[in-house]
Regions:
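Glycine- and charged-residue-rich phosphate/anionic-cofactor binding loop of Rossmann-like
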Residues: 80-82, 350-363
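Conserved acidic residues
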Residues: 83, 101, 117
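N-terminal Rossmann-like dinucleotide-binding module
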Residues: 2-5, 45-98
């Protein structure tokens, strides 16, 4: 089986840090940097070090470069060994930074020839399911990039297949490895912000027009009749959706009872670049996430937990938390993060629980499915966006404030008076409700609008 070449991202993430950092305020847990299989506190050499697990990386360009650097970091720590790279066009020595390991465009054959125990799959969205099942058929464990699939049916085919094969599968929502996630859940459970009333998420990013031309599937909802479902909420800012659902305690498919979407675009693409979604959960608390790739200025995305007597803001790329509650001054906390590949190795060696199983992304995949089934994103009026001179990008004036307001008030764009959206109560362009359930706005009161803490 061959794999399509990995897709370059417009702005790849920096290489992983060489060693985990100290984490004041982090929740108790595994010691950062500990070697899976080693006995904590044992004298050097007292416990035999496990053999490094052979890893094959499918997709080593674009965002795959981050995974390549991470695998090499863990290789230096003796946890894994990079056994092979699957690319249609092999990496050169200059790209790899030396002599690369075995390379092949045939993913299945490469898994077999290298004896891989783990496959890291970072390929175009619509190839994920087939590659995951190819690994599962060979008993190879998986770290599968997000989004795990372009539709709920493909997700179920993947999840059921890996479960039947008995392999471990981790979905690559790196933010869910943050120690801030369980810490925030504990604060909410302890009543730190009163009764939780809803979760907001905000992502205001900028992307040049070339971003949507970086690969044949970029900016597409379908390619050659196959679902792709690229888009602001399903791909670049998917972490905001998944993290908001995780903090709401609504991660499984059955936790979702209704979804409203508003999908728009300033670019000449099929997919959305400015969108929002409101999820009604079985708990009755709304989860609203707004995103744009046409911001006036780039900002760090965040998730906001609303309560009757306070709020908690989580900048998930920074592992930074701000707690604001009645009767207390603001408290800022910084947390560590467990790398998801390292957690997968730990699971295989010591039996440690996986952090992001396929079932724990079922609610996210319900959002992807709602976006897939929604009307195609509506083009914004020409007067609603402008080009930035010398920057080759499009901006929607005022969208930064709308994204923040959506997270603050749990509202959709059409309810916030956006000049390019219809008033609340009318069918906004590109909008859809995927359930007959009452809307989240009807089922839970909005907290008063507050100043954004971005």
């Amino acid at each position: 089986m061959t794999t399509p070449e990995a897709t370059p991202e417009a702005a790849p993430e920096p290489a992983p840090e060489p060693a985990p950092r100290a984490t004041p305020g982090a929740t108790p847990g595994a010691t950062p940097g500990a070697t899976p299989g080693a006995t904590p506190g044992a004298a050097s050499g007292a416990t035999p070090r496990p053999e490094p697990l052979p890893v094959v990386l499918a997709g080593a360009r674009g965002h795959g470069r981050w995974h390549l650097a991470n695998i090499r970091r863990l290789q230096e720590d003796g946890l894994v060994r990079l056994a092979g790279i699957c690319e249609l066009t092999p990496l050169t020595e200059d790209e790899y930074g030396g002599e690369p390991p075995e390379q092949s465009a045939d993913f299945g054959a490469l898994l077999e020839s290298t004896g891989a125990r783990i496959a890291v799959v970072c390929t175009p969205i619509h190839t994920h399911t087939d590659l995951a099942l190819a690994a599962a058929e060979r008993g190879v464990h998986l770290l599968l990039e997000k989004p795990p699939a372009p539709s709920y049916a493909e997700f179920r085919r993947m999840a059921d297949g890996v479960a039947a094969a008995g392999i471990a599968c981790q979905i690559g929502f790196q933010s869910l490895g943050s120690h801030a996630v369980p810490a925030i859940r504990a604060l909410v459970a302890d009543g730190a912000i009163g009764r939780p009333t809803g979760i907001g998420g905000a992502g205001a990013w900028v992307r040049p027009e070339d971003y949507f031309r970086r690969a044949p599937w970029a900016g597409r909802r379908r390619l050659n009749g196959v679902d792709v479902i690229d888009g602001a909420l399903t791909n670049p800012l998917a972490h905001a959706v998944a993290t908001a659902l995780a903090l709401a305690g609504s991660t499984r498919a059955e936790d979702v009872t209704g979804i409203e979407t508003e999908l728009l675009r300033a670019h000449d693409i099929e997919s959305d670049d400015t969108s929002c979604v409101r999820v009604t959960t079985a708990q009755g608390r709304p989860v609203t996430v707004a995103a744009t790739l046409c911001a006036e200025r780039a900002d760090d995305p965040y998730v906001l937990v609303h309560g009757t007597s306070g709020r908690i803001t989580f900048w998930y790329k920074q592992d930074r938390v701000l707690v604001q509650r009645a009767g207390h001054g603001p408290e800022e906390l910084h947390f560590g993060r467990t790398d998801l590949l390292e957690n997968l190795v730990d699971h295989l060696v010591t039996g440690a629980p996986l952090l992001v199983t396929p079932d724990a992304t079922g609610a996210f995949m319900k959002v992807v499915e709602a976006i897939r089934r929604a009307p195609d994103p509506a083009p914004l009026p020409a007067a609603a966006w402008r080009r930035v001179p010398g920057e080759n990008r499009r901006v929607v004036p005022g969208v930064d404030g709308l994204v923040a307001a959506a997270a603050d008030t749990l509202s959709l764009y059409s309810e916030l008076g956006a000049s390019w959206a219809l008033p609340a109560g009318q069918a906004a362009p590109g909008s859809a409700r995927q359930s007959g359930e009452p809307s989240a706005q009807q089922s839970a009161p909005h907290p008063p609008k507050e100043v954004s803490t971005r």
